[in-house]
Amino acid sequence: MQNQRIRIRLKGFDHRLIDQSTAEIVETAKRTGAQVRGPIPLPTRKERYTVLISPHVNKDARDQYELRTHKRLVDIVEPTEKTVDALMRLDLAAGVDVQISLG
């Protein structure tokens, strides 16, 4: 697996879960002898929703909600077979979306 790179993107609504999962991935990769770049924090996406409170009139009465999507990027350079096996067996939090690409 020489001259390869594994790029891992993590997404989630809770930044603490993402940071914890990122720390587990980095620790596992370093323990198996791979070179790690990151974690790199990517821009947080903020989605804002405005909802009318009143069912009929009073347009001034509104509630505002915000949904933040936090993202992190980890590059594993020159992974070994042990690294790939350890990452496959890694159990991450349920609130974290993981995308893995080989390059």
From Swiss-Prot:
One cellular component (GO) term of this entry: ribonucleoprotein complex
Annotated signal sequence range: none
A Gene Ontology BP annotation from the UniProt entry: translation
Keyword Ribonucleoprotein: yes
One Pfam family per UniProt: Ribosomal_S10
Role this protein plays: Involved in the binding of tRNA to the ribosomes.
Subunit structure: Part of the 30S ribosomal subunit.
Protein name: Small ribosomal subunit protein uS10
